[in-house]
Amino acid sequence: MSLSANISVEAPIENQIQEIAYDGTEIYQLPPTLSEHLAKCATKIDFSKTSSDIDLLQQSIKKEDEKKEEESKDPKEQFQSSLWPWDSVRNKLKEALTEVCVLSDVLNIAKEKRYMVLDPIPQEPPEVKQMVLVYARKKALASAANILQSGVERLKAVQSDQGVSRSNSTDFHIELLRLRRNWRLKKVSNTIIGDLSYRTAGSKFMHPGMFEVTKAEDEESGSPPASPSGSGAAGTVACPKINSALRVNVPTELQGVAFIKVITQKDQEDLCTATVNMMGSTQLVPQAGAWQQTLEYAQNVLFCKELFNQLAREAVQLQAPIPHVVVGNQIRATLLPGIQLIISLCHSTSSDSNNSSEPIKDHDHVLEHSLHQLLREFHHKNTHHPFPHPASGPLGPSKKRMLAGPSAYDRHELLEMTKSQTLLEQIIAQAQHIFTRRRTQYVLDTVARDVKDPMITSHWNAMNSPTMSCVKINITSHGYDANLRTSLVIHVKERSLKCICRDGRIMHMSYEPQELRDLILCQISQHQIVCLQNLAKCMAWQILSSSSHLGIGSVEPLGNASSCVLASPNSDRLIAVQVRCDSQIDVKVFIAQSPAKDFFPGSLVQGRHWEHLGGHFKEVRFDKMEGKNFHNKMEFLMASLTSQS
């Protein structure tokens, strides 16, 4: 029985599918006949190994028989068999059951002839409706499609998870490359360290300005909770809403937003306010990443701290008439009597405090730009030293000092070259100039508003230096511009004014606004008299006398009055004009007639020629005269007094 082989005599339930047509029809492959199956099985037999296999089987049978004999000789087995007396009965019943089963199978085979047929018997195909077949195939295709789609979704999810895990490192290196283009990085051991300081630009600030670059997943897994004080990590300032493969960790003292506020106060009233903030625009660069704004804010904090530290150190070292005061994050310096310059460092680690603060009024962008330029220039001087010319000359002196010998500079010029101003002195000088310029603008505007005749126009030069401005003032009369135009130029400096008149006179004034106002009123008075004289010449009137500083009459509160005396072409009419230098530009006009009608010869004066001395001057009610302005009224008056003869 051990050498018997199992032979399948049953036909397969289904035939193999050879092809499926486009309409869903399945073409089955016919089963092989008995001879084909026998030939196929015969090809699988290796007759070269049959003898060796038989020998191996015989050897294995002998070994089994020997083992059985040894087991039968074992006393333990004998003892156990004695313990089971029904063992022989069980074996006999089992053999009888096997024989009965075999007999039953033989009878069934003999009774049913189909079991003896090796070739399949063709049966009549059952009638199947086409619609049922189509519906069944569609249902089978739909179930197969659902299985395929679910498999595709699972594969897609797996691939996306694997892609994210693989792309994290790729995105990290790409963003690290972008970070390296804009910021200085170096690798120390297993960490990446960046530099925010301005040391390469010439800064000598002691703060290291370092930041650490880490992967996003590393930081998310080990990030500490936010502190109750409101100061979060640097990466959480601008990066929580933007996915990024890397995170930057800046020091605690560089977190948040910082700016420097400069205020000019007079009696607790803000005259000028400016803020220093390097963030010109808070929009992120698309190629940069979520870390760009964080680093810009941190560098802005470092910049403001360096600037304030430099100003505070200079404020302590400078010896001013009124000492500068440094208290905490505030520096107080005196610009002018009663006017203070307050420089404050404002540093906020809360992102909401900056947004909730009210906008600063009267923002001075010029002072803000100047503070930037001063620190940039300070950095530039630390790294850029003038090269000697010729090359064999000493290293260090500037080109101007090298030309001192050939140019024969005196001691005063050499001392001027050695002087240099600190950042605080330059800021104070610029603040003084801004305050003086605002005062000058206010005086010019108020005088132009109060004085209607003549017209005053101011032209400020657009190309100015931080400590000096230039304004040109034109005084003209409406309708008589070609007759006379009085011009004067004023140079506005830090604490003084320099006025250059049309005739070349130069006058120096202090920062007090009243001095400039008095000067303009005097120029208006002289303009009225000079323009009247030019008008009289055009109308053939004679100028008998003229004075820009009349020394007779009552004492004027401001300067001296200007006056002139005019005579008609026939000398029969006289006009005396007096212009006072007050806020209203008071004008008085007197007329006289020659010869005098009330002249009577007497015992003392008997000659008729004395009648040409003129009579008494009578004042004209100038405000009641017709005319647009002073010169128009004087033109009408001279025209009416001119004799027809």
From Swiss-Prot:
Transcription found in the keyword field: yes
Compositional bias per record (Low complexity), positions renumbered to this chain: 222-234
Top-level taxon in the UniProt lineage: Eukaryota
GO cellular component, one term: mediator complex
Keyword set, alphabetical order: Activator, Nucleus, Transcription, Transcription regulation
GO molecular function: transcription coregulator activity
Region (Disordered): 215-234
The UniProt record lists the keyword Ribonucleoprotein: no
Subcellular location: Nucleus
GO biological process terms, semicolon-separated: regulation of transcription by RNA polymerase II
InterPro entries noted in UniProt: Mediator_Med17
Function: Component of the Mediator complex, a coactivator involved in the regulated transcription of nearly all RNA polymerase II-dependent genes. Mediator functions as a bridge to convey information from gene-specific regulatory proteins to the basal RNA polymerase II transcription machinery. Mediator is recruited to promoters by direct interactions with regulatory proteins and serves as a scaffold for the assembly of a functional preinitiation complex with RNA polymerase II and the general transcription factors.
Similarity field: Belongs to the Mediator complex subunit 17 family.
Subunit-level organization: Component of the Mediator complex.
Record's protein name: Mediator of RNA polymerase II transcription subunit 17
Source organism per UniProt: Anopheles gambiae
